[in-house]
Curated annotation (Swiss-Prot):
Protein name: CASP-like protein 2D1
Subcellular location: Cell membrane
Membrane topology: Multi-pass membrane protein
Coiled-coil ranges per UniProt: none
Positions on the Extracellular side per record topology: 37-64, 114-145
Keyword presence, Nucleotidyltransferase: no
Family: Belongs to the Casparian strip membrane proteins (CASP) family.
Principal localisation: membrane
Cellular compartments per GO CC: plasma membrane
Protein source organism: Glycine max (Soybean)
Glycosylation-annotated residues: 48, 58
Tagged with keyword Cell membrane: yes
Pfam families in the record: CASP_dom
Length: 185
């Protein structure tokens, strides 16, 4: 049983309104970033007289990024709305798990598009793949912009996931170690 009451425990709730504001702001910032990523990617196409038309739906990594961006935007909107409802705010574990899932999905799509962009920009000479960005420069530039926006979206969700982890685990007290037990060893 604890005999010492931590004075910082009463100050623990002092930062919650600021944390809620930061969390909500990040969620709301992720929405236009995700929508912009989708719009840039879906409208991206370029025609080359030698190789033909290249569209986003020719590349599975870009289709995956559009899908994850749509999921990020919808989830961010839903989570921001749910954070205003008091019964959902008390369910920190729901936000923790769902924020983790969305952050992981976002990083997987960033990695997939980054790999695709690297191959398009540099090629893979050992596999006899030539680089494609010299032929499709505008397409590659828009993919790069979409990748940057999606990476910023991931960063938002990473910070959101850290905040939700803090909320979920801050309700537990740290383990108590009796000083006599430590000295006795």
């Amino acid at each position: 049983m604890r005999t010492h009451i931590d004075d910082s425990a009463s100050g623990k709730n002092h930062h919650l309104p600021m944390l809620w504001f930061f969390d909500s702001s990040l969620r709301l910032c992720a929405i236009p970033l995700s929508v912009a990523t989708m719009w840039i990617t879906v409208t991206n196409k370029e025609d080359n007289s030698s190789y033909g038309m290249l569209k986003y739906n020719n590349l599975s990594a870009l289709k995956y990024m559009v899908l994850v961006s749509a999921l990020c935007a919808c989830y961010a909107l839903l989570a921001a709305a749910c954070s205003l409802v008091r019964c959902f705010v008390s369910k920190a574990w729901i936000f923790f798990v769902s924020d983790q899932i969305v952050a992981y999905l976002a990083i997987t799509s960033v990695a997939a598009v980054m790999e695709m962009y690297y191959l398009a920009y540099n090629g893979a000479k050992e596999d006899s793949w030539s680089e494609a960005c010299s032929s499709y420069g505008s397409f590659c530039s828009k993919v790069k912009l979409a990748l940057i926006l999606h990476t910023i979206t991931f960063c938002c969700f990473f910070v959101i996931a850290v905040i939700s982890a803090f909320r979920a685990f801050s309700v537990f007290d740290p383990p108590f170690v009796n000083s006599q037990e430590v000295q006795g060893d």
